[in-house]
Amino acid sequence: MSIILENEKIPRYLRVYNYYKELILSGGLKSGTKLPSIRKGSMQLQMSRTTMESAYLLLAAEGYIVSKPQSGYYVTDIAEKKKHVNVSKMQVNRENQEIRYDFVTSSVDKESFRFELWRRYMKSALRQDERLLSYGEPQGEWEFREVLCSYLGERRSVICTPEQIVVGAGVQSLLHILCPLVADRKKVAFYNPDFQQGRAVFEDYGYTFCTKRDEIDHGVYYISPSQMTRWGGLMTIKERLDLIGEANRRDFLIIEDDYNSEFRYFQKPAPSLQGLTGGRGVVYLGTFSKMLLPSIRMSFMVLPPELVKVYEKRRHMYNQTASKAEQIAITQFIRDGHLASQIRKSRKIHLAKATELARVIREVLQEKAETEIGESGFHVYVSLETEFEASELAVRTQKKGLAVFPHPQTEDKERGKIKIMLNCANVMVEDYKSAIQLLKECL
């Protein structure tokens, strides 16, 4: 087994990735062929296991190979499928502005999730006939809430009991339960005003919207401390403690939406606001949409003790919106340690993809671009030299079949630079160069 490694400009894991990709597409490795194990491959190529694992994860993310538990990596039938692709479908339909490279849509890389494993847990849940004959508990299945307590305490320093947890199909449905519980608090402020789905719920309940935190005495403050805006932003421990102190002094309730807290590339996740308060004065919200799949509509809310009694009086008014079968499946999935391993795998895949996207951007655009990999989420932030506003550039790229997200602010425009954001999950690594070439044409 040999491989060309003299191109030092390309990271070693990408050289391994390209080597195997070409072998697969050329027919040198047939569908069903087992690749060397990470240990054996690293010895054969005289590379580290981390290098081999990164290459294999990228190959899996692009569909060239598939991981079979306790067996290894196997070549898929992607080469055969590519032979039958209708080339005309791959061309950009300019009239309809068909998007060929979508760097905007927030999704999960298909190879970061073990579908076969998840199907096994769902099948097990669906075999529990007696449990499925009854409606689910309005608050969520008890064993699911027990598991959540342990998981949140260990991973996010959340302090709670199963009685404090309410399960629902999405954060929006949980906010509809929460708003009547805090009806005496008539004012709300969002750190990130772009969260329209959340704002819509409070608007439905007649809340007054405030633009500043110092306007919400005895009100509600909604914040995502692990990703404060779409463009990232992480609250420091000091900022968290300052917010808690201010909430105590001015008697406002904090709603902590812990979105993307598990996906920290370069540092450990900060402890939750809820945990820092000792479990009081904070409503904690979490979801499995990024940790598992967006289609698994499973979110949860941890009520502070002072709101639990209020909820218990109204609990009979609500039906459970989340799937009972999925709650049963996730419960065992977490117990068996698969959620933690799923998060680790997802981090590795998306960091590898983001790193490669940033490299391609610098290679193609050179001095016209500066890149930064987002600390939270799956994004690459790009500062560009161009005569256009960010929103204008987004329109120009869309006409060429390339979707990018423009930064709404223009603070860098004085020095001829704008910012855009690229989500790396939805575009295949092999398409990065073509996509960035299109971006270059639009500058």
Residue map of PLM features:
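N-terminal basic, amphipathic alpha-helical segments
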Residues: M1-K123, E130-L133, E312, H316-S323, ...
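Short glycine- and hydrophobic/aromatic-rich loop-to-beta-strand nucleating segment
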Residues: Y73, Y222, F300-L303
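Short, polar loop motifs at secondary-structure junctions
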Residues: K89-Q91, P193-Q197, R213-D214, P408-D412
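Short beta-strand segments
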Residues: T105, F190, T211, Y222-S224, ...
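Short, solvent-exposed loop/turn segments at secondary-structure junctions
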Residues: S106-K110, Q172-S173, D194-Q196, S226-T229, ...
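Conserved core of the PLP fold type I
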Residues: A125, D129-R250, I255, S261-F263, ...
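PLP-dependent aminotransferase class I/II
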Residues: V282-E363, E370-E372
